[in-house]
Amino acid sequence: ISYLIEHPQYTKVAAAFSGDSGFYSGAQSMKKALEEANEKGILKSETTILPGISSVSALAARLGVSWNDAVLASIHGRRTNVVNLVRKNTKVFLLLSGKNDFEMLVNKFREAGINNVKISAGYRLSYPDEKLFTFYLDEFETKLFDLPEGVYTCLIENEDCEEQILTPG
C-alpha cells in the first residue's frame, strides 16, 4: 500500500496471491487494507478479486467426493485443533504447510487414539505435476518419503467420528 501511495502514477495495479482467494488468503488482508486507505482518503482505488481454482474443490473433484458435508480448516501458518475437528466430523478438508505438518498430525492422532482415519492429499492441484496421495494412519511412515515438500490440501476422513449434538437437549 505504501508503494501505491508513493507512486500515484500507477493507476492499474495487480497483486497475485497463491492459493484460494477466499480460504485463508492474503487477498482478504490486502482488500481490507486498500478499503481502509480509501476510507482515510489516502488512496482512491477499486478492488476486484479474480479467483482461481479452489484447492478444496479441486481435491474433492479429483477424489470424487462432495464437500458440502465437510469442515474446512487450515494449519498453513496458523494453529487449529485438528484432532477435535477430526474426532467430531466425518470429513475435514485441511490446508497444510508441508511434510512436517503430516508428521505432526499423525502423531497427534495417535496420541488422541484416533487410528482409523484415511488421509488423501493433493499437491500442486491443477498443475501438470499435480500429485495425489492416499494413505491410512498405519501406512504413513512408508508414504512419507513419497511426499514432495510444499503446500498440501488434504481430506481427512474419519468413519468412527463421535456423534455431534446439533440441537440443544
Regions found by a protein language model. Give the residues of each.
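Glycine-rich phosphate-binding loop signature in dinucleotide/nucleotide-binding domains
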Residues: H7-T11, L43
